[in-house]
Amino acid sequence: PYVTLLLIAANIVVFVLIQPRGGDSLEDIDRENRFLYEHAAVPCEITTGSPLTFAEITTGECGDAAGAGPVIRSEEPFFPSKNVYLAIFASMFLHGSWLHLGFNMLFLWVFGNNVEDRLGHVGYLAFYLVTGVMAMLTQLAFEPGSTAPVIGASGAIAGVMGAYLIFWPHA
C-alpha cells in the first residue's frame, strides 16, 4: 500500500515539521492562526474567489455571505498571494491536534490499504484527492460564507471508508 503509506507520511511530516502548533501564549496562537488563514481552505474565499481581508478575518463576516453579487472590498486581501483553490488540497494535509491526526491516520491505514489494492496506486490517489475536494464542496454548500479555515483529511478518508463499504459490504 505505497500510496497509503505516502499519504500517512505526508500528513505526519506536514503536522510535525511545517504546521506551527504548541503553546498557549497569544504569540503561539496568533502564529498558528496566521498559518491556517494563509494556507487552509476557507469557504468564504472559495465563494468569493479571493483571499479574506483583515476585516473579514477579525469580524468573521464574509463580504459576499449571502451570495447577492460581486464582493465590494475597501481593503486588500490579508494574504494577497494565496491561491484559494490550491488551498483546498493543502487543507487535506493540515490537522488541528495530535488526536485529529492520529485518528485520521488510523482510519486511513485500516481502510486505505484495501481500497488501494482494489483501485491501484494511481486510481487510489486520484480517488482520495477527488473525495477530499468533494468533501470541501459539500462543506461549502452548507456554509458558503464561513470565514473559518477547514482542515483535515476526514473528508477524503470518509470517501475511502465509503469505497471500502461498497467493495466489501459484508466485512
Kindly label every feature range from the protein language model.
Residues 1-171:
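A detector for small-residue-rich transmembrane helices and their helix-helix packing motifs
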